[in-house]
Amino acid sequence: MLSNAGFVLVGLLGLGFLGHAARSPGPFREPAERWPYAVFFAGLLLTGLGSAYYHWAPGDARLAWDRLPLAITLMGLLDAVVAERVGLRVALRLLGPMVALAAASVGYWALTEQRGAGDLRPYALVQFYPLLAIPLMLWLLPARYTGSAGLLAAAGVYALAKVPELADAWVFSTARVVSGHTVKHLLAALAGYSVLSMLRHRRAV
């Protein structure tokens, strides 16, 4: 459960930074560009809280509150890149539907789980599509800001975080100190911090 503190900390730092950025133009040309990042950092904060809630007493009913904030977090980051590489107007129109899609993917899993055949395919799509779409947009579309490497690093570190999660039992049996799931939490929080660090240092081009 302690590994969830990283999500909470990065989420709070990110939201605080966005609040400060509203009073200084540094990382954003237009104030509305903050909204997708607000969803991202709020999602990280809620991921930490939701995951702690689940791990306190694991069960399917609580697992939805672990998965939902993370799905929203990923959609927020994807929409932030859409805002900067495709267009702010497009991103703002997509933000609500993307959050709804994230919620629907978890809701669909919960519904099918109750019927005895939990279907994670929509949730997996929400998880992995941003990891493909973000690097492609960074590569193919012109940048409006410096710091693209920070976004690429965040996507890469989060993708890396999925490896120890899939090898959870092996990591714990080898390390005897932490589980693969714990390592995943730490790496995912680091991915979130990469985004915050990028925002702190980037400039318009």
Residue spans for each PLM region:
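Early transmembrane hairpin module of multi-pass membrane proteins
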Residues: 1-98, 106-116, 145-204
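Active-site rim beta-loop-alpha module in soluble metabolic enzymes
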Residues: 104-145
